[in-house]
Amino acid sequence: MAETDSFLHLARPLGPMAVGSAPTTAPLNVVIHPQALFSILDHSLRRNADQERVIGTLLGTRSEDGTEVEIRTTFAVGHTETTDQVEVDMEYQKQMLALHLKANPKEVLVGWYATSSELNTFSALIQNFYSGQGDGTFPHPAVHLTVSTEPGKDVETRAYISAPVGVTAERAADSAAFIPVPYEIRYGETEKSGLESIAAARDVESRAANIFTDIEALERAVEEVLGMIDRVSKYVESVIDEEAPASTALGQFLLNALALAPKVEPADIERDFNNHIQDVLVVSYLANTIRTQMELSNRLATAQLTLGGESGNAESGQRGGQRGGKGGRGGQQRTQDRSGEEARA
């Protein structure tokens, strides 16, 4: 989904803004985390049938120089939109923002998102609110992230900042020039494994996928590497045989990749690989052993509680019977005393 287009930034406010009140429009790079995209897509799936798009707030971190913004989390904001007006629940947005910032003090407000690629007057109104002073991102620009969620089409993502425009101050309040900025979707190895597991269920009718074990994941990774090596070998052979056009950039990339390969003997590589396999097997065995012990411990604890409850009820019944027996003996003794008194009388 990431784009590699070039961008030209014109950092000049065009509206009648007071000195020191215009947000900066310096070039920046936007980094999007997968969990933020999943949250946006989930919000889009849960929208009302009559809503064309939904909006929400973007939270993340900003570099010290302000040239890079990381979008880490999001939350939905309710709004209603008609042909001539838009209403946004700003009070809810402020309360949710305060709660999120209290739970994650390192994160800040970085912008807002919409599940539509369209940029209109309402988009400018919302953008000016998020980039304004006080509750907005001022003096930093607010990032507007658009995620296209049309059924049957690929998910398209765009990132923008804005510059104020307008002949008068009244027109500048509901106007903005959206400037596209470069972005990238950044994820780690753990997130990549999760994304691959989710993508595996894309073509399954039940939308369910099995979670691979460590050995299966390693096997899949080795197969992917072998497949890539095979494709590169075929491409190099076709270039040598003049069956495919040569690419200087691709050749330089392959040369740099080969230069990163460690200069070791094949026997050493095989030994290290086997040692790694043994480590993975040991970790898998220990994990399964711990899981079995936990299940056994839970079952023993449940059985002990069950047996303890039954024995407790039995002891209570016996104690009650003993108290009843004592009461019976007391009654018999009092009857005998009364009989003796009557005989003396």
From Swiss-Prot:
Residues 318-331 have a biased composition (Gly residues). It is found in: Cytoplasm. Residues 308-345 are annotated as: Disordered. GO terms for cellular component: eukaryotic 43S preinitiation complex; eukaryotic 48S preinitiation complex; eukaryotic translation initiation factor 3 complex, eIF3e; eukaryotic translation initiation factor 3 complex, eIF3m. Residues 335-345 have a biased composition (Basic and acidic residues). The keyword Protein biosynthesis applies. One of its GO terms (biological process) is formation of cytoplasmic translation initiation complex. One of its GO terms (molecular function) is metallopeptidase activity. Keywords: Cytoplasm, Initiation factor, Protein biosynthesis. Transmembrane segments: none annotated. Its main location: cytoplasm. CDD domains: MPN_eIF3f (cd08064). PROSITE patterns: MPN (PS50249). Residues 30-166 form the MPN domain. InterPro entries: eIF3f (IPR027531), EIF3F/CSN6-like_C (IPR024969), JAMM/MPN+_dom (IPR000555), MPN (IPR037518). Pfam families: JAB, MitMem_reg. Component of the eukaryotic translation initiation factor 3 (eIF-3) complex, which is involved in protein synthesis of a specialized repertoire of mRNAs and, together with other initiation factors, stimulates binding of mRNA and methionyl-tRNAi to the 40S ribosome. The eIF-3 complex specifically targets and initiates translation of a subset of mRNAs involved in cell proliferation. Belongs to the eIF-3 subunit F family. Component of the eukaryotic translation initiation factor 3 (eIF-3) complex. This is Eukaryotic translation initiation factor 3 subunit F.
